[in-house]
Every structure is written in structure tokens, then in C-alpha cells.
Design a protein with these regions (language model features):
Chain A
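His/Asp/Glu-enriched, well-ordered alpha-helical/loop segment
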Residues: 274-358
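Histidine-rich, glycine-flanked metal-binding segment
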Residues: 22-25, 32-76
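Divalent-metal coordination cores built from histidine and acidic residues
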Residues: 70, 96-179
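Active-site core of metal-dependent hydrolases
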Residues: 174-278, 282-299
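Bacterial N-terminal signal peptides that target proteins for export
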Residues: 1-7
Length: 412, 443
């Protein structure tokens, strides 16, 4: 590992800015999809420092220190993954090499930490990642550390949870309840109470099998507008569909009308092609697209953000719709819009660049079935707070033969 | 565009075919008005034949892939049958009717599970370490060797918390520094380099520890190298060296005098290694060292692979003995040096696919003295990689962020570890969802 030397040398070779170079990076000629600003066209995006400086049809290359030719690529706000696992849970992943490399610049850890463990989460992960990390704090004080803890109703304190949230209002954006394997609704009621005390949304993962004596209808009744049901296209979580008619249940539509939100939370066991296909056919797309990415699903379903988006494209969602459900919509859910999820001028320069590949591609779902599709979205470049963090196609760098006796070519 | 259905058959369809054959033969027998006894005998014979052909032996049959198995001299279209954790059979035209699941690999290359001998996967250890599974198995790597993240003080924790839990076969070079790769404070301190303690640890875990690592040592003396050489000798194991030349501690002396045959110098295409002269000619001592048995490993990482060094060296015939990543938290982002990326670079520079596979299977297996690995044997463990060589326009960054544009890219589409499909990027081994019925409550 000669990384230390490499790091020292970055900055030795500095491109001398000529007069009039007002931007640090210019992404030129990409197809910009920015639903928050209703842009769906070829545009240039200029970045100064960590902010978006300008989005316009033609920004001259000589106004920028570094120009990245994005022609043929799709440029979007950095994606927001509302349901990720980066702490606490045994299958947690490091977000930089799994999310920044797949176009997500913001992730929300979905219940890994509770009020007892949030400080450790902050010190060991949130403060050290290049990915922007928020938390849906678990209503369980110990967090998502196995069934003994997660079923312990004595450790579900709305007051203590709300107090921790008040301590970190910029980092904790909601409450998670998950995996409650006792009868009834206690976990949900406590989570909603914490949501009421802290004025934040609750995200719910709760099975409805008869053994727990729970119904989807009652769960919807306890939930408030703005609360989210994750794992929506599973077949053991939310009864979106009537199993015999394969049509959307009337009470599910009513819940949506009331303002209950439906999140994907794909994961290892919670996305089944027939459920998603039937729901999409009956006009029940998700409100937010998210991954539930963890050490299991990264192998079985490969469900990172572009993978989940590609699956919805196959079932009839348009790309701008999918980008909206992966940027501005989740930003609104966690109440970080318009700071995040937009390419608005003056906003933070979190940007994702994708290739929409045409061909024949296989995708897999929770029961390990295969879907053949003709489009696949693939992340190629990511900018986080104005800094390039991932560049699969080397778009930001010169060819080695033309770089002379090059030192480390600085990362823009 | 037509969508190609998954080419997966199962034994039910095979069985149905045989039933049909039996019925047909019965019908034909009847219409030819053969004697009853003959009919019965024929039917019994047909049933027996069907039963033999339908005896399911293979859990999985990898059909029609282009197999590259350097150790056994295989290079061509072949089938591989897997039963349980092992390879049951390798050969042409193995009967699909004997398999529970058949995967058509006509478009792909099939190789032994790849071996990456320079990784940093002590994920509960120092900061730069990565998750051991998802940065290996997804790239066809079934054996990874952690290169000195832990020393004798931390190894048992590493083993308990990570090695024993990983799905990839995780081996280790033990750092001669007792504390392991925890920064200059310990890594520059000869008092940390206790030869006896290191030797004892290697001997205690011969299944896990393949050798000794020395790295990052800055004082201009030979303490670290010489102690590591001694520890490797005393424990009869392999040495991997990361070396920063200093005034009075030259590279030529390292590879011609201090290191022993079979020792590995990693990062040899790096800028710190004087492998080329001012005219970019490979130095004579490089050839001499190779002749005396010093092995040269890539160890790409954030700082140790430069096209402007590797391209001229390879043109002069100085290829790496082993291709490895030095994968860690920085190198996996930019320049994104996972093993498929590093392999693709060599393929585009001009190595043949066979040369690349040799340097990621047989050669590393020999280098770490695990010649049971990196090969496909009947009865051997089924660690297998399925690779696609994509054609198109691809770009690759080196450690200085210089870009090579190439027309080939190696992508792992399937990985088997101990006979189990652990990575199947496009669901090649899975049935098509639209024909799988309403699979509610799949669990």
C-alpha cells in the first residue's frame, strides 16, 4: 500500500487555472434528468467547490478547470437510498464501495442503531464515510442486533428515542420498527409515538402472518400520513394485492390516499417479480425506490439502486419517474429537500452519471427467479460534494500516453 | 428484439421425454403385432434404460463453457458436473439428464476459482480493510490471501472474527510486525518484529497462514526484511515483501541478496521500484532475480500500478508471475482495482486470456504452496469462476489516474464456492420467473 505517498503527491501537479476559469468541474453534454427542476434534456452542469454553480444548455469548456465529456450518459442528482444497512445489523455493508459506486450519494441506515448505540454509529461510520449517511433510528434501544433484542418491548422507549433524535436532528431523520415477532402492534405503536414526539416519519417492516395476529388494515390505521411501509413488493409483508384477483386491495389504495407511503426496500427476501409486475400493471408504483442492500442481497438479488431501477423500467416505469422516486421523493420524505435530490443551482454537488445499456440482461428476485430485460442502468461516475469519488470509465482523466511522465493526476 | 429465455432444464422434462419414448415404443410394438411376451420384455428393457439415464447424479451441470484449466492442460469446450461440494466429472457431452440443474455457458469462459494473493480483508482490523466476501466472490475470487493486515498479536482475533466466518477461502500472510498494519508507529519499530513469535503463530495455524509479510518499513536498514526472511525460513513458509528503496538499502540487493528463491516482491510495477532504467529498459537485475526464483507480484492498490512502467516492461517480456489487487478501502474507489479490473488491464496491454488466467490461478497457487488450488480436478473442490470477455470500448485507470482505453473487459458472471452458486450476476442458473407460476409464499 503506497497510498500515503500517492495522497501526498495529489496536489503537487495542479492544473494552473487560466483567466476566466470560474468552475472547478464541468459535466458537458450529458442528458440531465432532474425531476425537481423539471429538466429532462441535454444540458451542461458546472460545479464550483462543493456546490452546483450552473445548469444550462451550453456552458463553454474554457470556463472550467476540468471538463468531463458526459455525452451519451445520463446525469442525475446523486441518488438517495432510503433503506440501507451500514451499521449494527450483522449483514451491514461499508457504504462507500457499495453505494457511491452505484450512484447513491446519500443513504439512510434503516434501523441498525437504537438510542443506546447511535453515538457509536456516528463515530465509526457516519463521521468516516464519504457517503452521506443518515439514520432511521430503531425503536429498539440496542438496534437491529437479533431477535432477542428486537422483541424486547421493554427496550422500546419512545421518550429515550425521541431524546436521541433531538440531540442529532440533522442526522436522525425518522424511526424504524422491524422484525417484531410477537403478537400485536406494540412495536409499531411505540415507534409511532416516538415519531409523534419527535415530529418525524416512521418506516415499518412488519410481517402480517396470522401467527402474529396482525392485519394490514390495522397497521395502516396506526400509521400516520408520511409514514412509510417498506418491503412493499414482498408477499409476506404488505398485502398490496389481493392474491386471487391479483389486483390492488382497496384498503391499500385508501392508505395511499391518506398519505401512507410505499417504499421498495428490495433486499434479499422482499421483492418478488409477480407481485411487482401485477402491482405495476394495476397502477401501484412505489413512492420511493430503495435497496435494503446488505451482505446477503448483494449476492442473491444484486439489488443496488441502478439494479432496482432497471427492474421497474422493465415493468413499465419511465426513467424520469424512477429518478424522481430515487431523488426528490426520498429527499422530501426525510425532509432534506431542497438541500438534496436536486441539481438546483447553489445546492450541494452530489451527482450521479449513468449509462443506460441496451441489450439482453438477466435480473434476479428474492425467490431466485430470473427476469430477462432489454435495458440496464449502470453507474459510471459519482461526484460527492463536488469531489469525484468513482469513475469507472475514466471520463475525468487523460490517456496515460498523453500524460507524459505523469505524477498522480489530481482527482477533481 | 427477442428475449432469450433462460436455458435451464430439469430432470422432470427429461423424465417426461423418457415416458414418451416408452409409450411410443409400446405403441409401435402393439401395431407391429409382436407377441405379448416380447412386448413385455421390450417394455421392461425400456423402463430399465430410462431408469439408468434418469439417475440424477449431478447437482449442477455447467454445459458448453470454454474451460481454461492451465494446470491440467484444458483449453476448450467442455462440461463440468458438480455433485455436492466437488467436481464429479469434466468432459465433453456429459448427459444433461443426470443433472438437477443445467446451465448453458456457451458464451462464457470457465476457470478454476481465481486466487488473489494480495488483499486487505481483516475487516474488524485496521481502517483500510474491506469486507472479505463481496470484494472477492463477485469477481470470481474464491481464494484470497490477506497480505499482512494482522501480525502475531492480532491474528487469532482476525481468524475468529473474519477468516472463520468468510465465505471466500481466506488465507493470510502474517505481518512480521506483531501489531500488524497499524501505521508508521509500529511498522517502523524493529522491537515489534519478533521472529520467534511470528514463527510460532505460522506453525500454529498452517491451514490459514501461508507465510510472512513485511511492508512500509522506512528506516534505511535491513532489519524488517532480514527478520521477515528469517521468520519465513524458520516456519518453512512464503515471504511477501513490500519494499521502499533507500540510500544504502537498494532494490538490487533486496532481490539478489536478501530475498530467497520463492519469496515474492509485490508492487513491482510501482514507482518506488527501480525496475526500468532511464530508457525504460528492464534492468538486468530483474531478469537475474527472476532466474534465481524471486517471484514478482502486481499488488495494484492505490499506488503500485502504472501503465507507463507496466506497458514497456511487458513489451520486453517482463510479465508478472502473479496478478493481484492489494484491494483496500481506497483502491476500490479510484482506480477501482478489483481483480477483474486488474486482469482486464493485462488483457488489453497484450497478454493472452490464458496468460491472465495462469497468473490468477496456477501461479498464485504455486506461489503460496497450495497446489491443490487454482485447478479443476475430478473429485476436487468445486471452486469455479465463470467469466465473460466483453467486447466494446472500455477504460481503465492506473494508480496515477492515467487512462488506458481498451476493447476487452473481463466480467465475472458466476462464482461457485464449494459447489454452491454464490454469485450469479444474471441468474444463469435460475428458472425464468414468468414460467415459474404465481410463486406466492416462496419460503
Amino acid at each position: 500500500m503506497s497510498a500515503r505517498l500517492a495522497v501526498l503527491l495529489i496536489g503537487v501537479v495542479v492544473t494552473v487555472p487560466a483567466l476566466g476559469q470560474t468552475y472547478d468541474i464541468l459535466l458537458k453534454g450529458g442528458h440531465v434528468i432532474d425531476p425537481a427542476n423539471e429538466i429532462d434534456a441535454v444540458m451542461d452542469v458546472a460545479i464550483s467547490g462543493d456546490k452546483i454553480a450552473r445548469v444550462a444548455a451550453s456552458i463553454p469548456g474554457d470556463q472550467a478547470k476540468r471538463t468531463i465529456n458526459a455525452a451519451g450518459y445520463i446525469v442525475t442528482p446523486g441518488l438517495i437510498d432510503l433503506h440501507a444497512h451500514v451499521f449494527g445489523y450483522g449483514g451491514s455493508l461499508w457504504p462507500d464501495d457499495t453505494q457511491l459506486t452505484t450512484g447513491a450519494t446519500t443513504v439512510v441506515d434503516c434501523g441498525g442503531s437504537g438510542w443506546r448505540t447511535f453515538d457509536t454509529f456516528k463515530e465509526t461510520v457516519i463521521d468516516r464515510t464519504r457517503t452521506r449517511v443518515f439514520s432511521f433510528i430503531n425503536i429498539v434501544g440496542k438496534g437491529m442486533v437479533g431477535s432477542a433484542a428486537e422483541n424486547d418491548v421493554d427496550d422500546m422507549s419512545p421518550e429515550k428515542t425521541a431524546a436521541k433524535m433531538a440531540e442529532y436532528p440533522d442526522l436522525i431523520v425518522g424511526i424504524k420498527t422491524a422484525h417484531f415477532a410477537h403478537k400485536g402492534y406494540t412495536a409499531l405503536e411505540r415507534a409511532v409515538e416516538a415519531g409523534r414526539l419527535s415530529d418525524n416519519p416512521v418506516i415499518i417492516d412488519m410481517r402480517i402472518t396470522t401467527e402474529y395476529d396482525r392485519t394490514t388494515q390495522r397497521i395502516f390505521e396506526i400509521m400516520r400520513p408520511g409514514d412509510l411501509r417498506t418491503h412493499s413488493y414482498s408477499d409476506h409483508q404488505v398485502e398490496i394485492l389481493n392474491r386471487s384477483t391479483r389486483k390492488v386491495q382497496p384498503f391499500t389504495r385508501e392508505a395511499r390516499q391518506r398519505g401512507i407511503l410505499f417504499d421498495v426496500g428490495h433486499g434479499n427476501g422482499s421483492f418478488v417479480f409477480p407481485v411487482a409486475a401485477d402491482a405495476m400493471k394495476d397502477d401501484f408504483p412505489p413512492d420511493t425506490i430503495s435497496t435494503d442492500l446488505h451482505n446477503g442481497s448483494i449476492f442473491t438479488t444484486k439489488s443496488d439502486m441502478p439494479n432496482v431501477i432497471s427492474k421497474f423500467l422493465h415493468f413499465g416505469m419511465t426513467l424520469p419517474d424512477a429518478i424522481e422516486k430515487s431523488t426528490v421523493r426520498p429527499a422530501k420524505v426525510i425532509r432534506k429537500f431542497p438541500e438534496l435530490g436536486t441539481l438546483g443551482e447553489g445546492r450541494v454537488a452530489d451527482i450521479a452519471v449513468f449509462k443506460l445499456r441496451k441489450g439482453v440482461f438477466g435480473f434476479t428476485d428474492a425467490p431466485q427467479r430470473r427476469l430477462m430485460a432489454t435495458k440496464k442502468l449502470e453507474a459510471v461516475l459519482t461526484i460527492r460534494a463536488g469531489r469525484l469519488v468513482f469513475d469507472q470509465d475514466g471520463l475525468a482523466f487523460p490517456e496515460w500516453q498523453t500524460a507524459g511522465d505523469y505524477e498522480v493526476i489530481p482527482i477533481p | 428484439m427477442t428475449i432469450r429465455r433462460a436455458v435451464v432444464s430439469n430432470r422432470k422434462t427429461g423424465f417426461a421425454m423418457h415416458l414418451l419414448t416408452i409409450c411410443l415404443s409400446l405403441f409401435l410394438a402393439a401395431v407391429t403385432a409382436a407377441p405379448l411376451a416380447a412386448q413385455e420384455a421390450e417394455a421392461a428393457e425400456a423402463t430399465e434404460a430410462a431408469a439408468t439415464a434418469d439417475t440424477v447424479i449431478y447437482d449442477l451441470l455447467l454445459k458448453n463453457g470454454h474451460v481454461i484449466d492451465i494446470q491440467n492442460g484444458r483449453n476448450g469446450r467442455m462440461d463440468i458436473a458438480i455433485t455436492g461440494r466437488t467436481i464429479h466429472e469434466i468432459g465433453e457431452n456429459l448427459p444433461a439428464s443426470r443433472a438437477k440443474n443445467v446451465v448453458d455457458l456457451t458464451e462464457y469462459y470457465v476457470t478454476p476459482g481465481l486466487i488473489d494473493i494480495h488483499t486487505h480483508l481483516d475487516q474488524k482490523g485496521a481502517w483500510l480493510n474491506l469486507n472479505p466476501d463481496h470484494n472477492t466472490l463477485r469477481y470470481g475470487v474464491t481464494t484470497a490471501v490477506d497480505a499482512g493486515s494482522s501480525g502475531h498479536q492480532g491474528f487469532e482475533k482476525f481468524k475468529k472474527e473474519t477468516i472463520d466466518r468468510a465465505r471466500v477461502r481466506l488465507l493470510a500472510f502474517l505481518n512480521i510486525v506483531g501489531a500488524g498494519m497499524y501505521g508508521d508507529g509500529v511498522e517502523n519499530d524493529p522491537a515489534q518484529m519478533n521472529v520467534d513469535a511470528a514463527v510460532a503463530m505460522v506453525k500454529k495455524y498452517p491451514e490459514d497462514i501461508v507465510g510472512i509479510k513485511t511492508a512500509h518499513y522506512q528506516p534505511a536498514d535491513w532489519e524488517a526484511v532480514d527478520r521477515a526472511v528469517k521468520a519465513a525460513e524458520l516456519s518453512n513458509s512464503v515471504l511477501m515483501v513490500d519494499f521502499h528503496p533507500k540510500e544504502g538499502r537498494g532494490y538490487e540487493d533486496l532481490i539478489l541478496k536478501h530475498m530467497k528463491p520463492g519469496n515474492i516482491h509485490t508492487h513491482f510495477y510501482g514507482r518506488l521500484t527501480p525496475q526500468l532504467d532511464a530508457n525504460k529498459k528492464v534492468q538486468d537485475y530483474m531478469w537475474k532475480a527472476r532466474e534465481r526464483g524471486i517471484l514478482f507480484d502486481v499488488g495494484h492498490g492505490s499506488g503500485s500500478f502504472w501503465f507507463r512502467i507496466a506497458v514497456p516492461a511487458i513489451k520486453q517480456g517482463f510479465l508478472p508471475d502473479t496478478i493481484s489487487t492489494d484491494i483496500h478501502k481506497n483502491s476500490i474507489m479510484l482506480p477501482r482495482a478489483h481483480l477483474n479490473n486488474v486482469m482486464s488491464k493485462f488483457l488489453n496491454i497484450g497478454l493472452s486470456l490464458e496468460q491472465v488466467i495462469e497468473r490468477t490461478t496456477v501461479n498464485p497457487a504455486k506461489a503460496i504452496r497450495r497446489t491443490d488450488l487454482g485447478r479443476l480436478d475430478k473429485g476436487g473442490v468445486a471452486d469455479i469462476a465463470v467469466l465473460k470477455v466483453e467486447q466494446g470500448k472500455f477504460a481503465f485507470l492506473d494508480s496515477g489516474h492515467g487512462k488506458l482505453i481498451g476493447d476487452k473487459n473481463i466480467r465475472c458472471v458466476m462464482t461457485l464456492r464449494r459447489g454452491r452458486v454464490i454469485w450469479d450476476a444474471e441468474g444463469l442458473s435460475m428458472p425464468d420467473w414468468s414460467t415459474a407460476g404465481p410463486y406466492s409464499n416462496f419460503r
